[in-house]
Design a protein with these regions (language model features):
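Extracytoplasmic catalytic/substrate-binding loops of multi-pass membrane glycan-assembly enzymes
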Residues: 32-47, 57-75, 82-85, 226, ...
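Transmembrane-helix motifs of polytopic, lipid-linked glycan transferases
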Residues: 89-110, 146
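Specific aromatic-rich, kink-prone transmembrane helix
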Residues: 101, 140-157, 162-170, 189-195, ...
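Transmembrane-helix signature of polytopic, membrane-embedded enzymes
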Residues: 102-125
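Membrane-interface transmembrane helices that cradle and orient dolichyl/undecaprenyl
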Residues: 107-110, 145-165, 173, 272-286, ...
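Membrane-interface alpha helices of multi-pass inner-membrane proteins
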Residues: 124, 128, 162-180, 184-189, ...
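Short acidic/glycine- and proline-prone juxtamembrane loop motifs at membrane-interface regions
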Residues: 130-140
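Extracytoplasmic
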Residues: 179-180, 227, 349-518
């Protein structure tokens, strides 16, 4: 190959990577600003800000997932300030990163750069852009995706240092959210162990084993220096979330028609890929094991999606599966493979447009579908740090202007309590940072479905009850505020303290629990 040809390939690659990086970054940045679903949109906002102020998860507030996401977001806040730009920048950077990884993966499996570029553009529209802001399920899934693609690309290579990095990504996925990576660890371990033993590649097994030991020691060290007791970490991040998963599994209902309708554009090409691969590959070849791992990854994500209560976020699998199908067609002897490839790209364009309109333009992931987004207003009217966001909350029944007025009045009431420690129970998880007043949120979310905190029937009820009481005493909290219009039940607090330890008052904006018995 001539130097001129090599330079041309490098220039083409650089051009595609540059366009992909810019497109995936700015498309996420754009759609992040359209509307707000506070309970999800701001899930990591104040919790990341609290880390910068030495309020740590597990130790200072109850957490069941999102440790890694909060820590990464606090890093963005540290560099760029605590504001909306730094918040959406985090997700936009992540969308850029995973899009580039997908492009590199596709070119590594010998897909033409142009087609890899097309598949990656589709991926960038269907991945983080559907949320636009940091979200636990997405971070957990995409860390696992990168790890999975690296595993597939490095099964037969001798770049053993990458297995340390893969293990690190698995840990990041777990500390973003415990699932789906827990399922992947169980199944991947069996497949990879059998593959490495068959190929007598014991060095990779050793590297993975010692990488796991290293990261576990690192975890214990981090907990120790931050004065987080391992027992508390175990209950909040390991044992309690396991009980949530068990409950959902016991109440799981499956409807075949609904299932196929939602996932048909994943299931059909996946079955076609499996059929083509079984026809031509040896069972234990690197290529077959790589495809098996991706099929396992896809099945795990479908199962995880069925178990979670969130909107569907796994349509990003479609362009990757189409990319793998393109590889099969390219290496086949089909007479009309060129036309089949073009037809596939047209189908993918249709699917991408369909879900782009539904999830990006209509913001379905944050439940803004059929909400009049044209009535949105600038969130900087709430506070200058929210500049760049357009406010429209699907769970507020009035106009955005009315809600902003309530939030501005709420800030004044909070300021009037500057001399006292208060606790706020709210889905508006940005008030801590914009008021510079500690809201002392006892947990990251406030739902009564058992996913936020232990209910009275849960075995960890007494543990959380003591956790909440200790927090109230330690911080000398004498008032707990609830926004009237949010209608969050008082049980979030009253289920965990005695009836004679509070009185309920109200003003124009809040219901207030005035606490006694905790001095």
């Amino acid at each position: 190959m001539s130097i001129l040809t090599k330079n041309k390939i490098i220039n083409t690659n650089f051009f595609y990577l540059l366009i992909l990086g810019l497109f995936s970054f700015f498309v996420n940045l754009y759609y992040a600003k359209l509307g707000s679903f506070p309970i999800d949109t701001f899930l990591h906002y104040d919790s990341a800000y609290r880390i910068l102020n030495d309020e740590l998860p597990v130790r200072d507030y109850w957490i069941v997932s999102g440790l890694a996401v909060d820590l990464i977001q606090s890093f963005f806040f540290k560099i760029f300030g605590t504001n909306w730009f730094a918040y959406s920048l985090h997700a936009s950077f992540f969308n850029c990163l995973i899009t580039i990884f997908v492009y590199i993966f596709l070119t590594n499996i010998k897909i033409s750069k142009l087609k890899a570029f097309i598949f990656s553009i589709s991926f960038s529209l269907l991945s983080y852009t559907i949320s636009g802001t940091p979200f636990v399920d997405l971070h957990a899934t995409y860390f696992l995706l990168i790890a999975t693609l690296l595993i597939i690309n490095n099964l037969g290579r001798q770049k053993n240092y990458l297995w340390f990095f893969i293990t690190f990504l698995i840990f990041l996925s777990f500390f973003s959210k415990q699932v789906p990576v827990t399922y992947a660890i169980l199944v991947y371990s069996i497949v990879l162990l059998l593959f490495f033993i068959k190929n007598r590649d014991f060095k990779k097994i050793s590297i993975i084993f010692f990488s796991i030991i290293f990261h576990m020691i690192l975890l214990i060290f981090v907990l120790k220096i931050n004065k987080i007791e391992f027992g508390n970490f175990y209950i909040q991040y390991l044992d309690y979330p396991k009980s949530i998963g068990s409950s959902r599994l016991n109440n799981f209902e499956f409807a075949i028609n609904s299932f196929f309708n939602k996932y048909k554009f994943i299931i059909i090409p996946l079955f076609l890929l499996i059929f083509l691969k079984l026809k031509k590959s040896k069972i234990f070849s690197e290529e077959s094991i790589g495809h098996l791992i991706f099929v396992i990854f896809t099945i795990i994500l479908i199962f995880h999606q069925l178990m979670t209560k969130n909107q569907i976020f796994i349509y990003f699998l479609i362009p990757i599966i189409f990319g793998l199908l393109e590889q099969e067609i390219y290496t086949s002897k089909y007479k009309y493979k060129k036309y089949i490839s073009i037809f596939m790209i047209l189908i993918l364009a249709f699917i991408t447009t369909k879900y782009h309109l539904r999830y990006n333009e209509n913001k379905k992931f944050h439940e803004l579908t059929n909400i009049q987004l044209e009535k949105k207003i600038k969130a900087e009217k709430i506070h200058k740090n929210l500049r760049g966001l357009y406010w429209k909350n699907p769970h507020y029944e009035g106009s955005p202007s009315d809600e902003v007025l309530i939030l501005n009045k709420a800030q004044k009431i909070i300021y009037s309590n500057k001399e006292h420690e208060i606790m706020l129970i709210s889905h508006y998880k940005f008030l801590d940072s914009i008021t510079k007043k500690k809201m002392n949120y006892p947990s990251k979310t406030f739902t009564m479905d058992g996913a936020s905190i232990p209910l009275t029937s849960n075995k960890h009820y007494n543990y959380y009850k003591n956790f909440l009481k200790n927090k109230i005493k330690k911080n000398n909290i004498n008032k707990v505020f609830f926004f009237k219009h949010e209608k969050i039940p008082f049980k979030i607090i009253t289920n965990y303290i005695e009836k004679n330890c509070y009185n309920i008052t109200e003003d124009e904006i809040f219901y207030v629990l005035e606490l006694k018995c905790f001095k």
